[in-house]
Amino acid sequence: MAYTNKVTISAAVATMMLFLAVTIVDAQSMPPMPKFNPVCALADLPNIVQLCYFNLDLTPSEECCNDLKSSSTIQVNCLCDNFIAHPSNGNISQARYDLVNSACGVADKFACKGGDASGGSTNKIAASMVLLGLVASLFF
């Protein structure tokens, strides 16, 4: 009669049952995460958003307006794609964006309507190449 280790077999069966249970059970559906452009991680967005839009003053500060006026094309595209065109990403209303942008005189610069305007049309292939270059520079 062959010797079988019951502990090993029972551990293997328990592990198999655990994996089957995980695959059979339906996962809770999570709300879709916004697609974040990797180039936007390099743009200094948190400071601009915090300084200008999370502040509840009726008139934006001079520093806020200067930051908005001197923001680069990448920053404008990232703000349009991730915050202004989708206000639910930052829990800031569209009226707040409009108020701050109008008060600072940059309403035309930040005029993006859900991605159909010219703002926010970042080239995805170029962004992925930049990310690939950054990752490759870490290894070589």
Swiss-Prot record:
Keywords: Cell membrane, Disulfide bond, Glycoprotein, GPI-anchor, Lipoprotein, Membrane, Signal. InterPro entries: Bifun_inhib/LTP/seed_sf, Bifunc_inhib/LTP/seed_store. Residues 1-27 form the signal peptide. Probable lipid transfer protein. Its main location: membrane. This is Non-specific lipid transfer protein GPI-anchored 33. It comes from the Eukaryota. Residues 116-140 form a propeptide. Belongs to the plant LTP family. It is a lipid-anchor; GPI-anchor. A lipid is attached at residue 115 (GPI-anchor amidated glycine). Disulfide bonds join 40-80, 52-64, 65-104, 78-112. GO terms for cellular component: plasma membrane; side of membrane. Glycans are attached at residue 91. It is found in: Cell membrane.
